[in-house]
UniProtKB/Swiss-Prot annotation:
Putative molecular chaperone that may promote the maturation, structural maintenance and proper regulation of specific target proteins. Keywords: ATP-binding, Chaperone, Coiled coil, Cytoplasm, Nucleotide-binding, Stress response. This is Putative heat shock protein HSP 90-beta-3. It is found in: Cytoplasm. It comes from the Eukaryota. One of its GO terms (biological process) is cellular response to heat. It comes from Homo sapiens. The keyword ATP-binding applies. Residues 204-223, 564-578 have a biased composition (Acidic residues). Residues 201-241, 564-597 are annotated as: Disordered.
Length: 597
């Protein structure tokens, strides 16, 4: 329960931080933040978030801005009182918001609890359209106070005042504040104004008793000259000049850039990128100790890092530019990228799993129901589903991740963890089905390279796999759709298909028994061909002659229905077209005609 303290007519309520906050508050800055200047970035970022909220609300209710039309951020250092204030005209907070949000770090809209670690005392003054103006104060101890504020009205928004420690007064200097703002918050979508208090000597007449010094308050509006990240597809006439100015401000180069690439990408992650190629190669291009790239990463226009190795290959380290995203996952300090769900596979791997398994296909439903994933999923291993065409090209170059090799479950040589009993059973199956495999290879001949016992099937009788370096079924379909494909390459990349049979399936066991009884039985041959063609379809391949497969299906249906083919044989019509077409009249004369030039 809060304690109420009455000072005249003003009521002050004291609240205790939640227990975990009181214990952890002294550790947060060292644990979450690698750079102490990040506190100012956090303040500006949260001010920007508050401005976004009021702007969104004003789209449906313009009266929300009656308490202040201008959306801006002000930074006011005061060296005399050793305070740094940041004021925004955002949505503000109600009394309940102050108590609930600033009491728990996980819910903190302004992260003010963290900023307190950089200050001896923290004061938050806020005004919401639906409530009175309140003040929140804390000395980073175990409690904070909330009371109605009757001081200078702020209209709407939030004013955060940090009473800085003696060793942090550098953040009251104009140079230092500008440096931090330009580095971390250069592309915030709202104007940032820095208020400075400077002393100037003023000339006075000789008859005045003492010399006076006047103080003049000036404001330095950094936002007027700071470059903006433009939207892709803007007016091209102004692009060249603006790109040139942006490049020079980004790189401090005195020459214009050689080339520029401005693009956006939408998909699982969305981002915009603006890349520049300089006119001259940097003098340290081939030095090993230099930065691997010169790409700055922003998330929601807030600077994150300038040394993200994954953004661009090392051999393109001369490229300058910025990348801005709305949805890249960050850690709590917004200082670095956080591993996304795409990369969580390795952390879920079992101890016995030596490889990362994946399957490519046209849709999630197709690959999830594929015969190739039956055994892998039964053993409790996760399979990465890759359903984009570009994935096929990527996995051809990406051979491993985090020390784990990438293995396609649709190719030969799939190795799964086995105990001694399973190994013994597999050897027995190979010996038992050896004759059937040889017979199936003889029947299929050049259609397959070999027929083997499968260790990947559970409920399916057979499947078609490709060689380790050949194309998968999905890649084969992609290449067939290419108008400018290389037919010579397709010839040897598509040729090697392996038929794997499931020794535990009743179809294969019955087929083995029929083959041992009479390997020349026509029904055995028909069944083998039908199984092969069906396996082609279920494995994602296309049939060269669909009509032949249809005829095999119809034939099996007739056998199942007990229909005699002789009874349904169609009679030849009397006016049927003769097999041999008679020669045309005058054909002999035509053959004697000579070609005349």
């Amino acid at each position: 329960m809060p304690e109420e303290v009455h000072h005249g007519e003003e009521e002050v309520e004291t609240f205790a931080f939640q227990a975990e906050i009181a214990q952890l508050i002294s550790l947060i800055i060292n644990t979450f933040y690698s750079n102490e200047e990040i506190f100012l970035q956090e303040l500006i970022s949260n001010a920007s978030d508050a401005l976004d909220k009021i702007r969104y609300e004003s789209l449906t209710d313009p009266s929300k801005l009656d308490s202040g039309k201008e959306l801006k951020i002000d930074i006011i250092p005061n060296p005399q009182e050793r305070t740094l204030a940041l004021v925004d005209t955002g949505i503000g907070m109600t009394k309940a918001d102050l108590i609930n949000n600033l009491r728990t770090i996980a819910k903190s809209g302004t992260k003010a609890c963290m900023e307190a670690l950089q200050a001896e005392k923290l004061v938050v003054i806020t005004k919401h359209n639906d409530d009175e103006q309140y003040a929140w104060e804390s000395s980073a101890g175990g409690s904070f106070t909330v009371h109605a504020d009757h001081g200078e009205p702020i209209g709407r928004g939030t004013k955060v005042i940090l009473h800085l420690k003696e060793d942090q007064t550098e953040y009251l200097e104009e140079r230092r504040v500008k440096e931090v703002v330009k580095k971390h918050s250069q592309f915030i979508g709202y104007p940032i104004t820095l208020y400075l208090e400077k002393e100037q000597d003023k000339e006075i007449s000789d008859d005045e008793a003492e010399e006076e010094k006047g103080e003049k308050e000036e404001e330095d509006k950094d936002d007027e000259e700071k470059p903006k990240i433009k939207d892709v597809g803007s007016d091209e006439e102004d692009d060249s000049k603006e790109y040139g100015e942006f490049y020079k401000s980004l790189t401090s180069d005195w020459e214009d850039h050689l080339a520029v690439k401005h693009f956006s990408v939408e998909g699982q992650l969305e981002f915009r990128a603006l890349l520049f190629s300089p006119r001259r190669a940097p003098f340290d291009l081939f030095e090993n100790k230099k930065k691997k790239n010169n790409i700055k990463l922003y998330v929601r226009r807030v600077f994150i890092m300038d040394s993200c190795d994954e953004l661009i290959p090392e051999y393109l380290n001369f490229i300058h530019g910025v990348v801005d995203s709305e949805d890249l996952p960050l850690n709590i300090s917004r200082e670095m990228l956080q591993q996304s769900k795409i990369l969580k596979y390795v952390s879920h791997m079992k101890e016995t799993q030596k490889s990362t398994y994946y399957i490519t296909g046209e849709s999630k439903e197709q690959v999830a129901n594929s015969a190739f994933v039956e055994r892998v999923r039964k053993q409790g291993f996760e399979v990465v589903y890759m359903t984009e065409p570009i994935d096929e090209y990527c996995v051809q170059q990406l051979k491993e991740f985090d020390g784990k090799s990438l293995v396609s479950v649709t190719k030969e040589g799939l190795e799964l963890p086995e105990d001694e009993e399973e190994k013994k059973k597999m050897e027995e199956s190979k010996e038992k089905f050896e004759n059937l495999c040889k017979l199936m290879k003889e029947i299929l001949d050049k259609k397959v390279e070999k027929v083997t016992i499968s260790n990947r099937l559970v409920s399916s009788p057979c499947c078609i796999v490709t060689s380790t370096y050949g194309w998968t079924a999905n890649m084969e379909q992609i290449m067939k759709a290419q108008a400018l494909r290389d037919n010579s390459t397709m010839g040897y990349m598509m040729a090697k298909k392996h038929l794997e049979i499931n020794p535990d399936h009743p179809i294969m066991e019955t087929l083995r028994q029929k083959a041992e009884a009479d390997k020349n039985d026509k029904a055995v041959k028909d069944l083998v061909v039908l199984l092969f063609e069906t396996a082609l379809l279920s494995s994602g391949f296309s049939l060269e002659d669909p009509q032949t497969h249809s005829n095999h299906i119809y034939h099996m249906i007739k056998l199942g229905l007990g229909t005699d083919e002789d009874e349904v044989a169609a009679e030849e019509p009397s006016d049927a077209v003769p097999d041999e077409i008679p020669p045309l009249e005058g054909d002999e004369d035509a053959s004697r005609m000579e070609e005349v030039d």
